[in-house]
Regions:
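Short glycine/proline- and charge-enriched loop/turn segments
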Residues: 41-42, 95-101, 178-185
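Von Willebrand factor type A / integrin I
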Residues: 143-200
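Hydrophobic alpha-helix feature that most strongly marks membrane-spanning transmembrane helices
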Residues: 27, 69, 105, 109-112, ...
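Short secondary-structure boundary/hinge segments and terminal tails
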Residues: 86, 122, 172-173
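Von Willebrand factor
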Residues: 96-132
Length: 200
């Protein structure tokens, strides 16, 4: 109808929501110190992908931050364990990635257990409006880390919570290899009992 009243064609363009808040929390605690990948046997070579889980977490935070900043969102990055190790907040545009890389360059994994209540309080102090909160950590086995579950529950009352976790391809391969070995052993045992004439 607007085009009918105007001499020019009116077009409605869709533009995604902007100025949302995105908070990325990187776990620097004990879980982040685990190596992803297996070291190569050669002493003179470095296997690509063999690094602490923290490295993958920092890369995730930088990538998410750059994408969200480019989309026009307000990005806040936190790295913590028992205390806040790095924080980037309130920086927009092209300066964001440089500031984030500088803030994270001194962050190393610690052997402390991550204080997830600290993460909750830091997120609440950082953003007052509903936000997307990305927790970059190892997903604990079901029911094992009660503090983590309580933190996720507390954050999800007000925010949308996403958990990002890197998996170790060598552990996944070992898990499937172990299952395969057990299945073959069970089949071999079954075959031997059949050959021996042992009844069930």
């Amino acid at each position: 109808r607007a085009s009918a009243r105007s001499k020019e064609l009116m077009v409605r363009t869709w533009r995604p929501e902007r100025d949302r808040h995105v908070v990325v929390v990187v776990d620097c605690g004990r879980a982040s110190a685990a190596l992803l990948g297996a070291p190569d046997a050669g002493a003179d070579t470095i296997e690509i992908g063999v690094a602490p889980r923290l490295d993958s977490g920092i890369e995730t935070a930088l990538l998410l931050g750059a994408l969200a900043t480019r989309a026009g969102d307000q990005v806040h990055l936190l790295a913590l364990d028992q205390r806040v190790r790095a924080r980037v907040s309130g920086i927009r545009g092209g300066a964001f990635l440089g500031a984030a890389a500088t803030a994270f360059q001194e962050v190393v994994p610690s052997l402390d257990v991550t204080d997830w209540q600290l993460a909750v309080s830091q997120v609440r102090a950082t953003v007052r409006h509903p936000a997307l909160v990305v927790l970059v950590t190892r997903v604990p086995p079901a029911g094992m880390d009660v503090d983590f579950l309580e933190a996720v529950r507390a954050l999800s009352d007000r925010h949308t919570v996403l958990i990002a976790s890197a998996t170790d391809p060598d552990q996944d391969r070992a898990r499937t290899d172990a299952e395969d070995v057990l299945m073959r052993a069970a089949a071999a045992l079954e075959e031997r009992t059949d050959q021996a004439g042992v009844a069930d």
